[in-house]
Amino acid sequence: MGRNAEFGTGRPIENHKHTIDSQTMKFLLLTPPLTQLNTPYPATTVLKGFLQMHKHQVAQADLGIDLVLGIYNRRFLQRLFASTGNPVGKPGMQRIYANHDRYVACVDDVVRFLQGKDATLAPRIANRTLLPEGPRFDNMADLEWAYGTSGTDDRARYLATLFIEDIADYIRETTAPYFDLIRYAEHLAAYAPEFDEMEAALNAQTTIVDHLLIDILSQHILACNPDVVGFAVPFPGCLYAALLCGKWVKDNYPGTKVVIGGGFANTEWRSLAEERLFKYTDFVVIDDGELPLLRLAKYLNNEIDATQLVRTYYLENNAIRYSGNDAENIPFAEGGTPCFEGLEMGRYLSMAEVTNPMHQLWSNGKWNKMMLSHGCYWAKCAFCDTCLDYIARYDAPTAQQAVDRMADIMRQTGQSGFHFVDEAMSPQLLKNVSTELINRQMTVSYWGNIRFEKAYNAELCNLMADAGCIAVSGGLEVASNRLLKLMNKGVSIEQTVNAARNFTNAGIMVHTYLMYGFPTETLQETINALEVVRRMFDEGIVQSAFWHRYAMTAHSPSGREPEKYGAVRTTFEPNPFCNNEVDFDYDFDYDIEAVGEGLKFATYNFMNGLGLDRPLRKWFRIKVPNPKI
């Protein structure tokens, strides 16, 4: 089936024309697949709230949850298994196919359970008599250790998630090689200096998942007849779907304009030189989208010319133009309250990919995602994109304004849990917001990113806990005071440990982000860092952690002046398509890939309370030194 063929309700309306009011426009703002399945991603909600303040008509949809619900139902699975037959040569997939009738029979029930609509299914799922068990069940956690005899709901959620993941694996192995539950063709955009591979995938034969996605898109367009379709692309795993959908809109609704923005554009497309991209979109906007979309509406209404567009790429005479006006922004306090209309919380799935309760927060719970403040109040870390607006421009509202927004969002969604998605919430703002919540006697739960500052003493941590803080996440990074100073992190191991202890004593869970492979880091320093992490787990002052390998980016201090950090960039020439991660030379005198594997292996076990007494060298497949702390 070609990309412009009719399927479902995807047939274009003949002679589709827009009558654009001089004052208002119709926007359809979309989050392409896939982000998270438990709650809406916080981009279109912000833009919808703002644009509606300016009298525009705005519809929004999460194509990710739409797509997943379109897949995980009896009708689709019947079509899927009928189309694949028994997948010869793939034993794991044959195992699933052998039980395909049970997958079809159970899928609607599992979805209802994960949506929170049928809690009575928990005992059936938990006792392992209801669900077929595919390859994902072969490596599951020790359920008795993780949940004991009382954690029936949590145990059932974990098993139901394995069931969902088995089906995702089956789809990927048999029909749609790009499909995953939280990303879609991520490898095509994760590091893409050239557009060729992405375009080849977009022009290849469509899969059953692609067809379903376009069918869903077409229904949204028919429902609101938009003048502008906007795609918020936060991650590489959302880009393929955004371009696939954008091309379909341009081909079938030439009167409708397509615009792409979001975190991916902000970091990757600041030197955009790939004209072919504009076969899939009409405009690309970078950084905060409120003012660019407001100006774009005026431009499309012929109220301003292109010189007044804000941070917008467009094609003119087959050449890319950039509008500039980079410094113009809407003050954060004037952005309005995010609007969740069109994103029904009851449709989302609370998953449990791991048994660790802190780690589960990212996938379990229908959190109201919102920013307390814009940017990072520190914005000095050498590995971070500190020259970009989303980091560099710190802008915080008053505590009263922040809590007013929280109260408004609670009324909209019916949920009292908040995930603050700030780059880093400041201790002072958290103190003020917590005090305001207590004074208003508002019952909420909240969590988000912090820096392990000295300000997080016992008094502040207890205040935050009393106001509803349940967890924090922050960076210990390389866990070496020498390297923390080199990267200008602004924290030390000692103050991180003290802050983590104060949070834990207040009943607040702690997750820490960790890093390895920073230039000049020795193997001894890496092993010492793992020992710091082991001790924090052993003391119980951190509940969850994750190691990232250092990546040099073009917009970070270490990418702009690599020689200050002992590294050499191999090229400063911009790529035509994506420009964020850059290649660099540093000669580590050890196998960094093997070290990364050992760090992650050890920490995964620490998170599950295992191996805390095991010698660190036994987590690695290469010879490593003993820690020296």
Where are the regions a protein language model picked out?
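Flexible glycine/acidic-rich beta-alpha junction loops that bind and position SAM and/or redox cofactors
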Residues: Q60-Y72, A265-R270, E274, R482-M487, ...
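Canonical Radical SAM [4Fe-4S] cluster-binding loop centered on the CxxxCxxC motif
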Residues: W362-Q400
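Intrinsic disorder/low-complexity segments
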Residues: M1-T24
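Conserved SAM/AdoMet-binding glycine-rich loop
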Residues: L28-L34, V228, G255, V403-M509, ...
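Glycine-rich beta-alpha loop elements in corrinoid/cobalamin-binding modules
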Residues: K26, L34-L37, P42-Q78, G85, ...
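Catalytic cores of alpha/beta
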Residues: L272, L460-C461, T520-R535
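A cross-taxonomic marker for long C-terminal extensions/tails that follow the last structured domain
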Residues: Q308, F577-I629
